[in-house]
Amino acid sequence: MKNKLLARVARLGGLSSALLLAGCELDVLDPKGPVGEGVKTLIATSTVAMLIVVIPTILETLLFAWQYRQSNTSAEYLPKWCHSNKIEVTIWGVPSLIILFLAVITYQTCHSLDPYKPLEAEANTKPLHVEVVALDWKWLFIYPEQGIATVNQLAIPVNTPIDFNITSDSVMNSFFIPRLGSMIYAMAGMQTQLHLLASEPGDYLGESANYSGRGFSDMKFHTLAVSGDEFNAWVEKVKSSSEQLDSQTYPKLAAPSENPVEYFAHVEPGMFNTIVAKYNNGMVMDKSTGKMIQVQQSAMSDMNMKE
């Protein structure tokens, strides 16, 4: 009776788990951009290659258990057997070839999907530059060319390369849009880069992939992939906001909070560099020369430079 009850509980638990897992979305396996497609291909290829070892091993284990079960008195008994060249070649050779194969495709994919590598675009398509700042517990997006900024909402035109510059004004975080591709760290005083492209319109969830405190679980944002005209209309919508982001208003935004979507019609020029320089004694790297340059001292003092 007790065994039957345990079996029923186990079956019910298994069915419940399957039902719950059915509600999970595997965004990484439903990519909407070339980088995401490359990641998906690598995952699928690696999984199939590993199953070449896993499936035969499971089948052989089941076959061995059946063949040499206690009731099978006709099974051949070889108490002095100790070696087989065929078995040795198989169990060492096949996995070694698979590991070599995985090493080659992983190396090739990692270099082809290098987050610092600019993406190819259609003729006359200019990349969009976005500066990203990880805060507690929200994301700040600065559009330097448009002179605007948003919190927890990122809009990008479809089929346009997006060049991200990423930093943090708090602990280390990870910037990740699963359906578009690569994840990369956001670190205080440093600038990391990421190049992505959305090949289809949609609303794609972005998130932090690093635990960073109490509000981490809600540190998400929406990525709106829209047409060029819709993007221009969105920019005008942001510019109609009455809010501005400068050295006076930024400290309030940077304070720990879980902000909803917020628009800033104007951003103080050089805001991103000022944030990075807070952790580098007022210095920031000039991308064109690779040299460290000094950020304006007035902006640094207004933002309460951290040691």
UniProtKB/Swiss-Prot annotation:
Keyword Transport in annotation: yes
Keywords, alphabetical: Cell membrane, Electron transport, Lipoprotein, Membrane, Oxidoreductase, Palmitate, Respiratory chain, Signal, Transmembrane, Transmembrane helix, Transport
Main localization, broad class: membrane
Superkingdom of origin: Bacteria
Assembly and binders: Heterotetramer of the subunits 1, 2, 3 and 4.
Lipid bilayer topology: Multi-pass membrane protein
GO cellular component: a single term: plasma membrane
Lipid tethering residues (S-diacylglycerol cysteine): 24
Keyword Cytoplasm carried by entry: no
Signal peptide location: 1-23
EC number: 1.10.3.-
GO biological process, any: ATP synthesis coupled electron transport
NCBIfam families the UniProt entry points to: CyoA
SUPFAM superfamilies to which the protein is assigned, alphabetical: Cupredoxins, Cytochrome c oxidase subunit II-like, transmembrane region
Protein name from the UniProt record: Ubiquinol oxidase subunit 2
Membership in a protein family: Belongs to the cytochrome c oxidase subunit 2 family.
Molecular function, one GO term: copper ion binding
Transmembrane segments annotated in the record for this chain: 46-66, 87-107
Lipid-modified residues, N-palmitoyl cysteine kind: 24
UniProt-listed InterPro entries: CcO_II, CcO_II-like_C, COX_ARM, Cupredoxin, CuRO_UO_II, Cyt_c_oxidase_su2_TM_dom, Cyt_c_oxidase_su2_TM_sf, Cyt_o_ubiquinol_oxidase_su2
Compartments where found: Cell membrane
